[in-house]
């Protein structure tokens, strides 16, 4: 069965979304996969060798008559890159503006994708040559991507499957802003059209599957995010507490809480080592020694495993801010699966109602701290109680082997696609 993956991000071994996609399709034949994506990125894995990329810059220029769209193949895969992103300068600034996600940004970006010309003879020839049997759409918070996925599926008269890795439907984070309700209603119109046509939804956690099944009256299947490796990592531990990953959704402020508390202890561990590809100055200004943080920038996937293996603990955190809580309510990232499998103790700092924190807490797979007032006690437990750390590690590894082994997600997807073939 040939699958056309439609997503913002490319298959990658570094970015969170790219890694999750890899875990979904790593056991599929390369010849059965193609991907349409829109970020300024190049693939850094060879899971798929057939790509069509259209960027925002190309779409804006296409309104003025310039051509948009590039076909990429095996010769464009760069496995040695630390990051899949290729934009810089003005292109990077354009992307960062789009990340602010105000109602006007949403409306403007959706508009230029509707006025622009991605749907060219070149694009349609690429789709026809691949001749997919279904579309696998990785959902996001921009209406135009739902429209594109639905248009391809309808034109080819093939099933559409929608993968939901975050909640963009129940939570209108711009509800109190000018045009916020208008923009969200327009977005949900595209969402409902795509979901009504779809054959099934793949959800990131059980709570999302339950809620979406009830709301959309559509079959929902939970796919736990797979770890990027299949067994516990072996390494000598150092006195290092590490955070690896995205600093968005106010996670940087959570790290500041932890870092400042660590500095108060008269111990060998007196800071957090942060590894992230973050470039926003408004976030990086917090990544300083004064806040108990040493910022290292991005590192390649192999080094991520090394850092994770050698750390005394790795951090998972989500913000206590109400708006941020709504935005990440159902989020369970690849990083959590890797952390569970790693054999390193997880320190989870955040509200207990968030799916990821609750999942770790319910399975006693992390030392969980659910309020700032409990930080001191929780960190003392982490640093001073080796027996407790080992107990948490054992629970985490067992949970990873139960739900997050590589290949499990792909097996579930294959089974569902066969049912509807």
What do the PLM-derived regions correspond to, one by one?
Residues 1-80, 220, 224, 228, ...:
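N-terminal subdomain of nucleotide-sugar transferases
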Residues 161, 169, 184-232:
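Donor nucleotide-sugar binding/catalytic pocket of nucleotide-sugar-dependent glycosyltransferases
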Residues 3, 134, 138, 150-171:
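Active-site proximal beta-strand in glycosyltransferases
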Residues 333, 351, 363-373, 381-387:
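Conserved acidic donor-binding segment of nucleotide-sugar-dependent glycosyltransferases
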Residues 249-253, 302-306, 314-340, 346-358:
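Nucleotide-sugar-dependent
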Residues 228-230, 234-286, 295-302:
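Conserved catalytic-core segment of nucleotide-activated headgroup transferases in glycan assembly
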Residues 76-134:
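Conserved nucleotide-sugar donor-binding subdomain of glycosyltransferases
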Residues 370-373, 386-417:
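A charged, aromatic-enriched C-terminal amphipathic alpha-helix characteristic of glycosyltransferases
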């Amino acid at each position: 069965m040939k699958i056309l993956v439609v997503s913002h991000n490319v298959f990658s071994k570094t970015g969170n979304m790219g890694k999750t996609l890899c875990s979904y399709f790593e056991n599929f034949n390369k010849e059965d996969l193609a991907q349409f994506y829109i970020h300024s990125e190049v693939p850094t894995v060879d899971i798929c060798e057939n790509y069509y990329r259209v960027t925002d810059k190309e779409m804006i220029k296409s309104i003025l008559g310039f051509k948009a769209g590039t076909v990429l193949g095996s010769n464009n895969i760069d496995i040695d890159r630390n990051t899949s992103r290729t934009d810089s300068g003005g292109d990077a600034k354009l992307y960062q503006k789009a990340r602010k996600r105000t109602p006007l940004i949403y409306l403007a970006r959706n508009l230029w994708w509707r006025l622009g010309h991605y749907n060219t003879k070149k694009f349609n020839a690429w789709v026809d040559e691949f001749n997919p049997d279904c579309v696998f759409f990785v959902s996001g918070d921009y209406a135009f991507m739902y429209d594109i996925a639905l248009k391809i599926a309808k034109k080819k008269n093939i099933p559409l499957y929608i993968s939901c890795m975050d909640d963009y439907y129940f939570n209108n984070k711009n509800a109190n802003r000018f045009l916020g309700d208008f923009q969200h209603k327009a977005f949900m119109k595209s969402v409902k059209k795509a979901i009504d046509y779809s054959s099934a939804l793949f959800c990131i956690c059980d709570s999302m599957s339950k809620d979406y099944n009830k709301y959309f009256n559509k079959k929902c299947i939970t796919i736990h995010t797979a770890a990027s490796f299949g067994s516990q990592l072996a390494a000598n531990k150092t006195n290092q507490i590490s955070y690896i990953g995205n600093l968005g959704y106010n996670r940087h402020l959570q790290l500041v809480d932890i870092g400042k508390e660590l500095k108060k202890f008269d111990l060998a561990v007196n800071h957090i080592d942060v590894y992230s590809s973050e470039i926003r100055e408004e976030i990086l200004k917090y990544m300083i020694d004064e806040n108990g943080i040493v910022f290292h920038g991005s590192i390649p996937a192999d080094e991520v495993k090394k850092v994770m293996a050698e750390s005394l603990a790795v951090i998972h955190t989500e913000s206590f801010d109400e708006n941020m809580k709504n935005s990440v309510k159902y989020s369970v990232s690849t990083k959590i699966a890797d952390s569970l499998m790693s054999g390193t103790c997880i320190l989870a700092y955040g509200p207990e109602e968030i799916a990821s924190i609750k999942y770790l807490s319910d399975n006693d797979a992390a030392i969980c701290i659910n309020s700032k007032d409990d930080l001191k006690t929780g960190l003392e437990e982490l640093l001073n109680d080796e027996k407790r750390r080992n107990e948490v590690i054992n629970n985490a590894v067992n949970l990873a082997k139960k739900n997050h082994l590589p290949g499990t997600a792909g097996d579930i997807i294959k089974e569902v696609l066969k049912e509807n073939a």
